[in-house]
Amino acid sequence: MNAVLSVQGASAPVKKKSFFSKFTRLNMLRLARAVIPAAVLMMFFPQLAMAAQGQDLMASGNTTVKATFGKDSSVVKWVVLAEVLVGAVMYMMTKNVKFLAGFAIISVFIAVVMAVVGL
């Protein structure tokens, strides 16, 4: 694909580089040279790579987070109420049913995320 760049009437074709031109042998060697030392260090010191012996510094805030963002909290109720209101207003403005379906999608998304996070 050639793009044409014109300067005061004269045109000169400019070739656009392909995305795959970045995956040359030299670039792959540079990547390997950067990744292999880090991989070797992680192999010899796995406790540093995985933080196996670390303590959870955020454990004391679990009760506060569950009280603020849990299933029965007011924050979730306000988010759902705001979604209903915004969806209704957008439907009235555009007459597009997708905005009404957005309420159901957001509600399901919030329920799934709460279950995954453990709230």
From Swiss-Prot:
Pfam families linked: TraA (PF05513)
Top-rank lineage group of the source organism: Bacteria
Stretches assigned to coiled coil: none
Ranges that cross the membrane: 74-94, 99-119
Its membrane topology: Multi-pass membrane protein
Record-stated family: Belongs to the TraA family.
The protein's assembly and partners: Monomer. Interacts with itself to form filaments; also interacts with TraQ.
Name recorded for this polypeptide: Pilin
